[in-house]
Amino acid sequence: MGKTGIQLFDDSRNGFFSVSDLGFDSSLNSSNYHPIGGLFASVNQTNPFASLSSSDLSNRGNNSFSTQLNDLYTKYMPGKEEEEEVVNGEKRKRKKKGGLTLKIKIANPSLRRLLSGAVAGAVSRTVVAPLETIRTHLMVGSGGNSSTEVFSDIMKHEGWTGLFRGNLVNVIRVAPARAVELFVFETVNKKLSPPHGQESKIPIPASLLAGACAGVSQTLLTYPLELVKTRLTIQRGVYKGIFDAFLKIIREEGPTELYRGLAPSLIGVVPYAATNYFAYDSLRKAYRSFSKQEKIGNIETLLIGSLAGALSSTATFPLEVARKHMQVGAVSGRVVYKNMLHALVTILEHEGILGWYKGLGPSCLKLVPAAGISFMCYEACKKILIENNQEA
């Protein structure tokens, strides 16, 4: 029989407690016994913390095997204190908060961003799902004429679960889209942003261009799903399901049909994404400059993200109104607009400037908290997903 071994203490880890490095070798020859350093319980009094980690285990013989778990760290900070850090040549104070902090080690930076974006999209969509449900009921005129009446009607007939009806489908759609959007923004923004103290080589802000790229990427990824979703809703009985709809559209109408009407959607999405990310990036820089702190807390990120969402929604809402007017322009009794500029001018002439912002309130009710929660979750996940042990 082979033996298994566990090394219980290893002071070289300097305070790490690890169970996911826990591995074992089993050898047919008892003389080939190789204990694998796995469970560490040595705690440093000056910086006590616990960690769950794993390392790549190599084969220790022809007749041996090993098991390993994912990298998972927890770090406990016993008290509140301040420490100084140097950022771009300036000394800034950073608060260290007590509590238990979870760290997950993922070496690939792209994977860290994608996972953070997916979590951000799923959480933000779930949190605002009740608002989306109430807004949908108001649009179709079911359940009441006000948000309060609709909420009471849903709670009476369906309970809390009624507020989250259809949320799983939205999460499946939004999570990968948000992951790609945030990944593209951060990647492009880092590539285009000049080093500290140097002038930018491009005439427009890097975050504005990166936001536009993020909007284009997100739209290109999700547009076929939106089109199929619309077909399934309107043309009931034609398709058996989502995969059948995809196959029939590609087979009978061609792959380009999946992107029919893409241009108007880009006109609506890209300006919002560009201004949203530009506002978020600018507000974060302004906060750092004002507070003299490099680290931005979760509550501050929530407020900054919400404010960025409000600013971008207000700035681009006239384009959204014009786009919707163009979509219904062929209906009897309505003006047929030549282009978006013509639609904007016509709305201004007939309804005044307030016509550009009709419906802004209900739209912000959903978009503003969703933007804040999404950015907060994204930044929080980036702090949890680390590259190496030193970041713990």
Curated annotation (Swiss-Prot):
Q: Name one GO cellular component term.
A: plasma membrane
The answer to whether the entry has keyword Phosphoprotein is: no
Residue stretches spanning the membrane: 113-133, 168-188, 204-224, 263-283, 302-322, 359-379
Expressed, tissue-wise, as follows: Expressed in root tips, the central cylinder of young roots, and maturating and germinating pollen.
Entry keywords, A to Z: Chloroplast, Membrane, Mitochondrion, Mitochondrion inner membrane, Plastid, Plastid inner membrane, Repeat, Stress response, Transit peptide, Transmembrane, Transmembrane helix, Transport
Q: Which PANTHER family match?
A: SOLUTE CARRIER FAMILY 25
Protein name per Swiss-Prot or TrEMBL: Adenine nucleotide transporter BT1, chloroplastic/mitochondrial
Origin organism is Arabidopsis thaliana
